[in-house]
Curated annotation (Swiss-Prot):
Iron-sulfur found in the keyword field: no
HAMAP family the UniProt entry points to: RecR
Keywords, ordered alphabetically: DNA damage, DNA recombination, DNA repair, Metal-binding, Zinc, Zinc-finger
Gene3D superfamilies per UniProt: 3.30.60.80, 3.40.1360.10, 6.10.250.240, RecR Domain 1
Biological role stated in the UniProt entry: May play a role in DNA repair. It seems to be involved in an RecBC-independent recombinational process of DNA repair. It may act with RecF and RecO.
Name of this chain's protein: Recombination protein RecR
Primary gene name: recR
Matching NCBIfam families: recR
SUPFAM superfamilies: Recombination protein RecR (SSF111304)
Record-annotated Toprim domain positions: 79-174
Zn-finger segments (C4-type): 56-71
């Protein structure tokens, strides 16, 4: 077996999402066997990210300022908001270069099994953004799984009385998958062919 401190490193690396025991071991060995790897720089960068990155006060995306680069960009279409579950979904949609509006990050999806209800998400903040009357369309871009569909249905129902056009991504995205893993072409076509709910 390994010395205790190496076991600790493998265990801590294994806590990261997508890093299983073998990947954690591989990363730990890489760090130990490559003295040229700047571990201090990695540590400083991790500390900086933790201290400097916050949630945008407008949309909930990651930001270094109170407002993220998308919300503060005057070239964005301020009449359309794309509602996503997580900041990683913003990245996936931005890669398509098919959407020029704003975003709203919910911070998850409705999941009664996991004890996550509408009040646990940034839905109230979304409704506050919609209340001023400048938004003409909401694009629901939640994951095509049960939780994402339940979340999209709930939001569409809540918004229905506001006279705002509500659309959702077109089919073509595999059911049960995450937006993050969809390729740019598929996601771009889903945006182009979005279907209006009301």
């Amino acid at each position: 077996m390994y010395v205790r401190i190496v076991q600790d490193l493998i265990r801590e690396l294994g806590k990261l999402p997508g890093i299983g025991p073998k990947s954690a071991q591989r990363i730990a060995f890489f760090i130990l066997q490559n003295p040229s790897f700047d571990i201090d720089r990695l540590s400083e960068t991790l500390q900086s990210v933790r201290k400097q990155v916050q949630f945008c006060k407008v949309c909930g995306n990651f930001s270094e300022e109170d407002e993220c680069v998308i919300c503060s960009d005057p070239r964005r279409d301020r009449g359309v908001i794309c509602v996503v579950e997580e900041p990683k979904d913003v990245v996936a949609i931005e890669k398509t270069r098919e959407f020029s509006g704003l975003y709203h990050v919910l911070g998850g999806a409705i999941s009664p099994i996991d004890g996550v209800g509408p009040d646990d998400l940034n839905i109230r903040q979304l409704l506050q953004r919609l209340a001023d009357g400048t938004i003409t369309e909401v694009v629901l871009a939640t994951d095509p799984n049960m939780e994402g569909e339940a979340t999209a249905s709930y939001i569409a129902r809540v918004i229905s009385a506001m006279r705002i056009r509500v659309s959702k991504l077109a089919s073509g995205l595999p059911v049960g998958s995450d937006l993050e893993y969809a390729d740019e072409i598929t996601l771009g076509r889903a945006l182009e062919g979005r279907q209006y709910i009301n």
